[in-house]
């Protein structure tokens, strides 16, 4: 009886805490859009600042644990990013992303560990654990800023693609290294590489199996909310399955998200369902980020950080320098061989943004919190990671916008938005006018009033059309945007038709080669 009562009280308390966190987060979201001075601060960074203010006055919300971050918060965030990462963009930038997510992690781990050991006096094995945690990037606020300011698609893909795969690699490196200070394992290069490949391979395999299985399953029915629910199940399912099989859950989620976003959504979902699922995941990402960044700020204990201030300063300097070496050095290699294996050439301006925008966040914190209690220096590692995360979020995160503007990397996003709104308005007015011209459907309406409405809508349509012409004359590149949207629409119609035929049982073969061919033809067409 007492156990049941205690469990009931625990559930009630946790629910109250959750509602408090949610209320604070949504209040900040509202203020960030209504108070002019707050509009200049990225939403996620504002959450961290408010969380720190709560921690300063000793208001503790929910305690962050590695399980809460890695198993509850991280899968939906990874899936949403992977769902929206287009394969064609990833294919164009695969080589630099691969370099950043593999060799880049190695450079960061080595480049952070040795300064912490040499100048900070940490045991080298412990320093490597802190370095592994800090090698995981989490540029959520920077990517949101890219989208808001209209940075290039290439910059978005490089930053987000690196982050997705980098997180998985960093977590695997940490898991391999954590046994060394505990004395349960020793470092052997061949064994370590074999384990690394195995863990990554299991994650990729789980993601592929779940992704393609669900893609084929959703071809057989058209139930938007069921398909939406299946994507949620796939995100957590891929993580749990990969982890239970000894693989990387992070890599599993990334792979299943990419498969469903680029393949499953094309062959198994109609445009309406794709829109519903995309909006759902946009909401989930906003919801989770709202909670996690507030909690990150709330977990930062300034008094504890001051105890390890020298280590934090060394780590900050090492993170900034190793990120610089990693981005500029690997970009140089990528650019040298871009003509042979990759079409991407990363400019110095883009390299600068990639360097400065390599923030640390929730993944680094989750890894640090998962350091075993048996390691005496556990609190020092946690303080180092929290200190670096705080610096990257508040200093680099708040100044990235000025770096983008200073390097003239702000795109034509305002014009694109205006163009999209005008086109949408034009389509809507044309449909309204077409309905008004069906006079027999309005027998009870006075003909004069009907004619007046037709003339009014016709005038509005002409005004919108004129604005579109002027906008295209002033910004000719918008025509290229229109052409790409048209190509995508044609591809969607083709995919939807094949999916309908499969559901009817009239087609059973894999349609992906047909879609790739069609996409290639569209790309090759003259604009």
From Swiss-Prot:
GO cellular component entries: plasma membrane
Gene3D superfamilies: 6.10.140.1330
Primary site of residence: membrane
GO biological process, alphabetically ordered: potassium ion transmembrane transport; regulation of intracellular pH; sodium ion import across plasma membrane
Top-level lineage group: Bacteria
Keywords: Antiport, Cell membrane, Ion transport, Membrane, Sodium, Sodium transport, Transmembrane, Transmembrane helix, Transport
UniProt subcellular location: Cell membrane
Keyword Ion transport assigned: yes
MF terms (GO), sorted A to Z: potassium:proton antiporter activity; sodium:proton antiporter activity
Family matches, as Pfam families: Na_H_Exchanger
Stretches that traverse the bilayer: 18-38, 41-61, 94-114, 126-146, 169-189, 196-216, 240-260, 276-296, 311-331, 352-372, 380-400
Membrane topology reported for the UniProt record: Multi-pass membrane protein
Stated family: Belongs to the monovalent cation:proton antiporter 1 (CPA1) transporter (TC 2.A.36) family.
Function noted in UniProt: Na(+)/H(+) antiporter that extrudes sodium in exchange for external protons. Might be able to function at relatively high concentrations of Na(+) ions. Also has Li(+)/H(+) antiport activity under K(+)-rich conditions, but it might not have any physiological relevance.
Name of the molecule in the record: Low-affinity Na(+)/H(+) antiporter NhaS1
UniProt organism field: Synechocystis sp. (strain ATCC 27184 / PCC 6803 / Kazusa)
Gene responsible for this protein: nhaS1
């Amino acid at each position: 009886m007492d156990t049941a009562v205690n469990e009931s009280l625990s559930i009630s308390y946790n629910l109250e805490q959750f509602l408090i966190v949610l209320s604070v987060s949504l209040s900040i979201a509202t203020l960030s859009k209504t108070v002019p001075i707050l509009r200049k601060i990225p939403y996620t960074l504002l959450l961290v600042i408010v969380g720190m203010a709560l921690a300063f006055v000793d208001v503790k919300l929910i305690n962050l644990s590695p399980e809460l971050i890695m198993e509850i918060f991280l899968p939906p965030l990874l899936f949403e990013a992977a769902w929206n990462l287009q394969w064609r963009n990833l294919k164009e930038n695969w080589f630099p992303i691969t370099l950043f997510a593999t060799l880049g992690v190695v450079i960061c781990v080595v480049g952070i560990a040795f300064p912490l050991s040499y100048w900070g006096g940490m045991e080298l094995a412990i320093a490597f654990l802190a370095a592994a945690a800090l090698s995981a990037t989490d540029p959520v606020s920077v990517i949101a800023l890219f989208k808001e300011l209209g940075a290039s698609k290439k910059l978005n893909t490089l930053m987000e693609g690196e982050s997705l795969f980098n997180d998985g690699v960093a977590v695997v490196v940490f898991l391999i290294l954590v046994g060394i200070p505990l004395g349960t394992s020793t470092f052997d290069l061949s064994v370590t590489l074999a384990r690394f490949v195995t863990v990554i391979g299991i994650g990729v395999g789980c993601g592929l199996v779940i992704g393609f299985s669900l893609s084929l399953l959703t071809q057989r029915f058209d139930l938007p909310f069921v398909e939406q629910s299946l994507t949620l199940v796939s995100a957590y399912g891929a993580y749990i399955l990969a982890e239970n099989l000894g693989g990387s859950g992070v890599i599993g989620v990334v792979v299943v998200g990419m498969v469903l976003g680029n393949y499953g959504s094309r062959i198994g979902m109609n445009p309406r369902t794709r829109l519903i699922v995309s909006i759902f995941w946009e909401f989930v990402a906003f919801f989770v980020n709202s909670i996690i960044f507030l909690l990150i700020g709330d977990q930062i204990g300034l008094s504890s950080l001051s105890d390890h201030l020298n280590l934090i300063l060394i780590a900050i300097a090492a993170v900034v320098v190793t990120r610089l070496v990693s981005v500029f050095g690997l970009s140089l290699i990528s650019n040298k061989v871009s003509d042979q294996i990759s079409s991407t050439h990363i400019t110095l301006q883009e390299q600068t943004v990639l360097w400065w925008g390599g923030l640390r966040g929730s993944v680094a914190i989750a890894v640090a919190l998962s350091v075993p209690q048996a390691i005496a220096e556990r609190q020092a590692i946690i303080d180092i990671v929290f200190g670096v995360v705080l610096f990257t979020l508040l200093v680099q995160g708040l100044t990235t916008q000025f770096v983008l503007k200073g390097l003239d990397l702000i795109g034509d996003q305002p014009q694109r938005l205006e163009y999209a709104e005008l086109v949408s308005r034009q389509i809507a007015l044309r449909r309204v006018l077409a309905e008004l011209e069906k006079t027999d459907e309005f027998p009870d309406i006075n003909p004069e009033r009907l004619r007046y409405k037709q003339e009014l809508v016709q005038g509005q349509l002409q005004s919108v059309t004129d604005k579109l012409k002027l906008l295209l004359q002033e910004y000719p590149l918008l025509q290229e945007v229109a052409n790409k949207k048209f190509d995508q629409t044609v591809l969607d119609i083709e995919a939807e038709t094949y999916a309908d035929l499969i559901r009817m049982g009239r087609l059973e073969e894999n349609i992906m080669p047909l879609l790739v061919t069609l996409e290639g033809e569209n790309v090759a067409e003259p604009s």
